[in-house]
Amino acid sequence: MISIEQEGLELLQFESTFLDNDVFSFVTTRNQAKIDNPYSSFNLGLYSGGDRDEVLRNLEQLSKVIGISSENIFLPHQAHGVKIGTVDEDFMSLDTDSKAKALNGIDALITNIPFVVIGV
């Protein structure tokens, strides 16, 4: 595992994912979270009970570090089931509210759109 720290943000990469130059994969951490407040560090979960404004700031910070607009970062509202969502041209043409609705209850995402971040 490789740790990359940039602008106070730590990203972890797995060497096995370097095989495809068209895909950049990473994991964010919340290593600085306080024991009594799991949302005190780098929380990206809009649906986890953390402060929404803080999450939006964190998404902007991530956006700057990876060089992709925060509008192209998609994280579903997981239901811990088996539904897989697709971020394709049809999805990208939706307005913001429709995208949020489409991501509700989704447990995994796939895409073929360049410069889009998908995660869980």
Residue ranges and their predicted role:
Residues 1-120:
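Active-site microenvironment for binding and transforming phosphate-containing groups
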